[in-house]
């Protein structure tokens, strides 16, 4: 069965969600979060993706990005996986895939929807009852 086509438009914000396989932890230590964020910063510049919001939960990632080209998001997520997964596997003495299939994405065409995505992403740790206030969660753009 063929995969559904991914529609990403240049200069239009995209909400990206990537889950850990079987919802296992993708980040176990503070160093894991820092390495992922370092790769995200470097690769977003390389692939011309403006990162507006992010939240790194223990078993999944939310990003709100605006790609410079139709291929930018896919290239960003591909290279994040190519850099982060080998690091994570080496660090935690494991093998195999870390992510559950392809990342999910949703185009945020209107300003109203972009703001809703910001709120959704940055309030994720509060909804998960990990913190009382979004500024208390160190692994999101809110902090």
Model-identified regions with their sequence ranges:
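Short catalytic/metal-binding and nucleic-acid-binding patches
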Residues: 1-143
């Amino acid at each position: 069965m063929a995969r559904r086509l991914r529609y990403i438009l240049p200069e239009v914000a995209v909400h990206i969600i990537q889950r850990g396989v079987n919802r296992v932890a993708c980040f176990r230590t503070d160093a894991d979060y820092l390495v992922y964020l370092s790769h995200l910063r470097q690769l977003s510049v390389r692939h011309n993706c403006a990162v507006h919001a992010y939240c790194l939960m223990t078993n999944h990632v939310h990003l709100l990005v605006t790609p410079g080209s139709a291929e930018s998001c896919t290239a960003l997520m591909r290279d994040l996986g190519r850099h982060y997964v080998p690091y994570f596997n080496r660090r935690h003495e494991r093998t195999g895939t870390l992510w559950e299939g392809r990342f999910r994405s949703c185009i945020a065409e209107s300003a109203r929807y972009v703001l809703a995505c910001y709120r959704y992403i940055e309030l994720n740790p509060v909804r998960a009852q990990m913190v009382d206030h979004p500024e208390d969660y160190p692994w999101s753009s809110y902090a």
